[in-house]
Structures are given as C-alpha cells and as structure tokens.
Regions:
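Anionic-ligand-binding alpha/beta catalytic cores of soluble enzymes and soluble regulatory domains
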Residues: 117-184, 189-192
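General beta-strand structural signal in soluble alpha/beta enzymes
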Residues: 6, 33-36, 67, 89-92, ...
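N-terminal glycine-/serine-/threonine-rich phosphate-binding loop
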Residues: 1-76
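A conserved acidic, glycine/proline-rich C-terminal tail/linker
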Residues: 180-247
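Conserved subregion of the PPM/PP2C metallophosphatase catalytic domain
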Residues: 86-91, 95-98, 104-114, 173, ...
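Active-site histidine-anchored catalytic micro-motif
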Residues: 27, 47, 60-62, 66-69, ...
C-alpha cells in the first residue's frame, strides 16, 4: 500500500489539497495520504525543508513525498523526482533539497511527464500527483525522465559567518511561537570554540547570553536559547509566545556575537 505525503503553503481553507488527494485516490483508492502540513508560509522553501527534514526519516522506505511550495518550473528550477534514503521526493528543484538532507541522494530525474490539462498553474495536481501514482505503481525513475546529476543548492538560506559573528534568520515559528533559526549546533561550536557569546534578537533590543538544555531552565516569561533535537538554534519565552510578544517574523535576523579570543 502506497504512502504519499503532502507538504504545501496552501493553508486549509481552499480546495487545493482536496483536489490533489482526489486525483491520487481515483487511481490508488487504497493509498494512505498524509498531510504533513499545509501551513508553510507562502513560498518559504526554507521552512518547508526544515519541516520535512525533521519528519521524513520517521516514514517507511518507499514513502512518496509531494512538496508543493514554489512549484513554478523554469530552466533553472525544473520539476524533479529525487530518491534519498529509500524515499521519493517530488518537487521543483529550487534549493529545497539541501534543506531536507545534506548527505547526498541516491538518484534524481527530471520530470518529463505530460500534464492532462493545458493549464500550468496547478502542477501539483496535474503533474506531481500523476508522477506519485506512477512511482506507487512501480514505474522506474527512468520512465519519468532523464537523470539529473546535481541538485540546486539552497545555500542562500544558510547562516553566514563574519569575524566573530554568526548571522542567521528565523526559518520556522512553531505552534508555541518559538523561533527556530538556520544556525546549526555544528556552526555554533565551530565558530564559538567555547567562547562567551551574546544572542541578539532585533538588534540589541533583546539579548540572551547562555544556552539552556530545557525551556524550564529559566523562569516563566524569561527568554531561553537552546539547541533542540532538530539541531538548530531555538529561541523561546518560557510559557509565553515569543514571536507574537517580541514582534518576530519569518526571516527576521538573529545574531550570535562571540567575544574576541
């Protein structure tokens, strides 16, 4: 039985997700369809990549993931299928794959499958769903399109380092209004080398000078910074909504300033 997931920035008020599911179920009535989320911020491939990165390994081998964020195709950003870790990812090659996995992929192909309509505004329904059905029915990737040797890099969304400063952005705000940044533990340790630091939010308006292991390491309503199981720097208010109270949005700048050695 095929397992097919959907990740999109459509929200839940419109018909888009239902239309895609209908196309799939009309051909695979026994398929298991999983909504990972439809609440990705519009066009945020960094957020979509973060969500998928932290859940796809929990799915069984052979799972097919449809990613409907920034799906417009171009010569630079073609539609592709990528096989990695025994699973299949159908998306536009817009840099998202470098956010999902950073240890390579098994195979990638261009999608050379004709749509059943003359419209090009809903490729997730008219193309991605069709490809998902083909894969679920056992079609080899070579039947879908020619091999793609390399994938586009989403490095524009990686944290940058200059002198003693790591500058990142907020890539996800969770249901508790906690901020997840694109600053990894690895980069933090490499640059910091154990030095004291100041985490700056909204310039010098809010600062944090230590890492915690738990939200409850600080008093209620106090700010806390930690590295969660996802491996990224997370900033929160204990038992409060940081993003709302501090006026933080996706792509807001976060700095980690290390003291001079």
């Amino acid at each position: 039985m095929a397992i097919i997931t959907l990740t999109s920035d459509w929200g839940t008020a419109d018909y888009y997700a239902a239309a895609v599911k209908g196309v799939i179920l009309s051909q695979l009535p026994d398929a298991t369809l999983v909504d990972i989320t439809h609440d990705i911020a519009p066009y945020s491939i960094a957020q979509a990549g973060f969500i998928l990165r932290n859940c796809y390994r929990n799915f069984p081998e052979g799972t097919i993931h449809i990613i409907a964020v920034e799906t417009i195709e171009s010569d630079v950003n073609p539609h592709v299928v990528v096989k990695a870790h025994g699973q299949y990812f159908i998306s536009t090659d817009n840099g998202i794959f470098s956010h999902i996995f950073d240890d390579g992929f098994e195979e990638a192909v261009f999608i050379d499958v004709e749509q059943d309509t003359d419209f090009f505004t809903f490729s997730t329904r008219d193309r991605f769903a069709k490809v998902a059905v083909m894969i679920a029915q056992g079609a080899p990737l070579s039947q879908i399109g020619a091999k793609r040797e390399r994938l586009n890099d989403g490095g524009v969304f990686c944290a940058t380092v200059k002198n003693n400063i790591i500058e990142g952005i907020v890539i996800h705000i969770d249901a508790y209004d906690n901020l997840i940044t694109n600053i990894t533990r690895k980069r933090f340790d490499e640059v910091g080398q154990g030095r004291d630091f100041v985490i700056k939010v909204k310039g010098d308006l809010y600062t944090i000078e230590e890492l915690s292991e738990s939200y409850d390491d600080v008093d209620p309503l106090d700010p806390v910074a930690l590295f969660g199981t996802h491996g990224y720097l997370e900033i929160a208010l204990n038992h409060a909504k940081m993003a709302s109270l501090w006026g933080i949005d996706l792509r807001s700048t976060i700095q980690v300033v290390f003291k001079e050695p």
